[in-house]
Design a protein with these regions (language model features):
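Phosphate-handling DNA/RNA-contact segment within nucleic-acid enzymes
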Residues: 69, 118-214, 229
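Short, acidic/turn-prone active-site loops that include or flank metal/cofactor-
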Residues: 194-199, 220-221, 245-248
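Extracytoplasmic/secreted cell-surface and envelope-processing proteins
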Residues: 225-227
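Short, surface-exposed amphipathic charged segments that create phosphate/polyanion-binding patches used
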Residues: 205-210, 251-264
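TOPRIM metal-binding catalytic domain and adjacent DNA-binding surface shared by DnaG-type primases
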Residues: 1-24, 28-35, 46-135, 156-157, ...
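Acidic glycine-/aspartate-rich tracts in secreted/extracellular proteins
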Residues: 38-40
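Structural alpha-beta junctions
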Residues: 234-243
Length: 281
């Protein structure tokens, strides 16, 4: 995180979306980068939108920034090899991965597939974010005790996906690393975006590179999740369908923890009609 900004937290949630994770606030309290609510000024990192806070009356609206300040807050982008070395230094023993997954109600094999590791110094899990070629472009952390989420300094947006992905024509797209792990635990060919509105171009490139013909987008059961799923579907040149967990279930991980089986997932997904790409409508 650049020194001019700090991560939101449960004590200081995002003033725009009111969530305790993913977003950042400038240290002077004048601006916020929200990763869920759009403004007319996308963050240069490609992840989130900038909102002028002022006295709180303009949160969620577009803003005009001082260009010199805006440019000065962009952290440098290290080569992906640096992230690879950093991540490799963390504990990736199978027993550790099994324990981390168990603590979240997930299958250890899914954490092994995603190469989830443990950073003892920060007491957090490390989830690598990858570009469509599989190179690590950043690291997402999740604190073991508090669940707080943040990214390694200099990280660029990427996808949560297995090091050795399946070669199938159908792809399941989720939101976040633990939802991706839940989908992988069911034996699905899955990748995850870092948030409900990010990663559209990354998914599009991945679909092209892997020759994917159909995508099932699993949306979080909230307005931002469903809006983001529809925007992603509209941007992809393949057949798509959007699956929302049943009422009372927040997301894919919650659904899996409540006993979802592969048969039940397939039945729920197959009840939804495939939608043609927008360019063919």
């Amino acid at each position: 995180m650049n020194s001019n900004w700090h991560n939101v937290s449960r004590r200081e949630p995002c003033p725009v979306c009111h969530k305790p994770d993913w977003c950042t606030i400038s240290n002077d309290g004048a601006m916020c980068v929200c990763r869920r609510v759009e403004s007319d000024r996308p963050a240069r990192s490609g992840v989130g939108w900038i909102h002028r806070l002022g006295n709180g009356s303009t949160a969620g609206m577009g803003c005009v920034l001082n260009p010199s300040f805006y440019n000065s807050t962009i952290p440098p982008f290290p080569h992906s090899h640096n992230f690879t070395l950093l991540h490799a230094a963390f504990d990736g023993h199978p027993d550790m991965q099994e324990g981390l997954a168990f603590g979240l109600g997930l299958d250890g094999a899914s954490f092994a597939a995603l190469d989830v590791r443990y950073d003892a110094a920060k007491e957090c899990m490390s989830f690598p974010m990858r570009n469509p070629q599989g190179e690590i472009t950043g690291l997402r952390y999740r604190h073991l005790a508090t669940g707080r989420k943040w990214s390694e300094k200099g990280s660029r947006d990427g996808l949560f996906m297995p090091r050795e992905p399946e070669r199938t024509e159908h792809l399941v797209i989720t939101e976040g690393p633990t939802d991706t792990a839940a989908a992988l635990s069911l034996g699905l060919n899955a990748v995850g975006r870092s948030s409900c509105l990010s990663g559209v171009s990354l998914i599009r490139d991945l679909v092209h590179a892997r020759q994917i013909r159909r995508v099932t987008i699993v949306a979080d059961h909230d307005r931002p999740g469903m809006d983001g799923a529809h925007r992603l579907a509209a941007a992809l040149p393949v057949l798509s369908r959007i699956l929302v967990p049943p009422e009372g279930i927040k997301d894919m991980r919650d659904w899996y923890r409540q006993g979802l089986t592969r048969t039940q997932f397939d039945e729920a997904a197959n009840a939804i009609r495939w939608q043609l790409p927008h360019r063919l409508l």
